[in-house]
């Protein structure tokens, strides 16, 4: 009987121990699930190298800043050697961009006006008052479009089964929805699939994304600044897409020893302690952000005389630029650059600084031409300015 009691006691003890272990295991699993569901803490590796700490490449940085000041410029194409900071610079944008207002929780980043226009259209519902719509401030989205992305990933998908069974348009937004009112970045854009290029061209022209599946149609705003980067040695960009970029920035490997040493030191310091490095440059980051906001506020007050506009038209005509995107882009970019410089009036000094960015990718290609595109633009600018001075 004693043996039986001992056996029962042992069995009970074993069960209790097993139950305790199981309880510990379940608790650990529940804890793990809870931790996964919580927003992950910002890891050191998630921090992007700060914009203001990037050495050199002023042309690329200016192009991006001008597009922040006036998104109507039409984006930036950055072409240059590998490892020159193209992707790093674009991804650093997020930290210096001003916050923008949107309807709270809106997947399309819509303004109150866009929300009211879309939600009330054709529904016969009572008018929505702007003061009834809750808003929030968010960072300007900077979205990556990977080369291997499918059309559904880019444009979004419609759940046909749910739409047919419940009558609800179940739409899963794509990258175009996420990038509305922000930046859409394509690394190695010259290697992008032709079909996706066609999609981007259509959306860039209309400012809207339309997804149609089995007779069901969804449309939403998709206005974004298109930023592409690539290495010209890996392939040319399709002319149709090339012309859609407002500015074209060229970057090369820095050949100044002191600057190269500085780049290595800054990068090592950032990699060792990203948070400390970000604190170190926070004042410069804030200073840049304030200057961008000031330029955005000044932009509507910037004016341009007809004489300057005439010189811009002459420049584009003398260079044989096809169409009128050249004049439009120079005009918008010159206004943005004047605002960036704190000036309320555009002069040919401003035009001279940004003409190469606006026109070099629009010049007709001549295989026998030995003159660099930048030199050609500078030469024609000198002629136009000389004629203007002579006329004066």
From Swiss-Prot:
Under the heading InterPro entries, the entry gives: AAA+_ATPase (IPR003593), CHLI-like (IPR045006), ChlI/MoxR_AAA_lid (IPR041628), Mg_chelatase_ATPase-isu (IPR011775), Mg_chelatse_chII-like_cat_dom (IPR000523), P-loop_NTPase (IPR027417)
EC number(s) per entry = 6.6.1.1
KW Plastid (keyword) present: no
Catalytic activity annotation = protoporphyrin IX + Mg(2+) + ATP + H2O = Mg-protoporphyrin IX + ADP + phosphate + 3 H(+)
Record keywords, A-Z: ATP-binding, Bacteriochlorophyll biosynthesis, Chlorophyll biosynthesis, Ligase, Nucleotide-binding, Photosynthesis
Cite the annotated pathway. Answer: Porphyrin-containing compound metabolism; bacteriochlorophyll biosynthesis
Q: What segments bear the compositional bias annotation Low complexity? A: 1-17
* Region feature Disordered, mapped onto this chain: 1-21
Keyword set includes ATP-binding: yes
Any matching Pfam family: Mg_chelatase
Q: Which residues bind ATP?
A: 80-87
Name the family the entry cites: Belongs to the Mg-chelatase subunits D/I family.
Q: What does this protein do?
A: Involved in bacteriochlorophyll biosynthesis; introduces a magnesium ion into protoporphyrin IX to yield Mg-protoporphyrin IX.
This protein is called Magnesium-chelatase 38 kDa subunit
Q: Which organism is it from?
A: Chlorobaculum tepidum (strain ATCC 49652 / DSM 12025 / NBRC 103806 / TLS)
């Amino acid at each position: 009987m004693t043996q039986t009691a001992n056996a029962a006691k042992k069995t009970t003890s074993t069960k209790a121990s097993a139950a305790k272990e199981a309880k510990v295991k379940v608790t650990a699993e529940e804890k793990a699930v809870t931790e996964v569901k919580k927003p992950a803490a910002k890891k050191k590796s998630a921090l992007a190298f700060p914009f203001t700490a990037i050495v050199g490449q002023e042309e690329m940085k200016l192009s991006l800043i001008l597009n922040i000041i006036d998104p109507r410029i039409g984006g930036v194409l950055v072409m240059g050697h590998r490892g020159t900071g193209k992707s790093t610079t674009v991804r650093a944008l997020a930290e210096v961009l001003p916050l923008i207002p949107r309807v709270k929780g809106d997947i399309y980043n819509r303004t109150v006006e866009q929300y009211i226009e879309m939600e009330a259209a054709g529904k016969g519902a009572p008018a929505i008052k702007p003061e009834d719509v809750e808003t929030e401030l968010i960072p300007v989205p900077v979205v990556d479009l990977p080369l291997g992305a499918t059309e559904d990933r880019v444009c979004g998908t419609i759940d046909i089964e749910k739409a047919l069974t419940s009558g609800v348009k179940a739409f899963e937004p794509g990258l175009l929805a996420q990038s509305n009112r922000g930046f859409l970045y394509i690394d190695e854009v010259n290697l992008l699939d032709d079909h996706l290029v066609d999609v981007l061209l259509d959306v860039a022209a209309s400012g809207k994304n339309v997804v149609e599946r089995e007779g069901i149609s969804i449309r939403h705003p998709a206005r974004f600044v298109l930023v592409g980067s690539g290495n010209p040695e890996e392939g040319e960009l399709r002319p149709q897409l090339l012309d859609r970029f407002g500015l074209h920035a060229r970057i090369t490997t820095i050949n100044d020893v002191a600057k190269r040493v500085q780049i290595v030191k800054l990068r090592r310091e950032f990699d060792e302690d990203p948070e400390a490095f970000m604190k170190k440059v926070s004042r410069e980051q804030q200073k840049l952000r304030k200057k961008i906001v000031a330029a955005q506020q000044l932009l509507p007050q910037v004016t341009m005389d007809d004489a300057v506009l005439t010189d811009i038209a002459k420049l584009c005509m003398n260079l044989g630029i096809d169409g009128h995107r050249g004049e439009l882009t120079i005009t918008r970019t010159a206004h943005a650059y004047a605002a960036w410089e704190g000036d309320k009036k555009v002069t040919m000094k401003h035009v001279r600084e940004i003409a190469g960015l606006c026109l070099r990718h629009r010049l007709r290609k001549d295989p026998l031409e030995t003159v660099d595109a930048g030199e050609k633009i500078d030469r024609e600018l000198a002629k136009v300015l000389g004629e203007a001075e002579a006329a004066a």
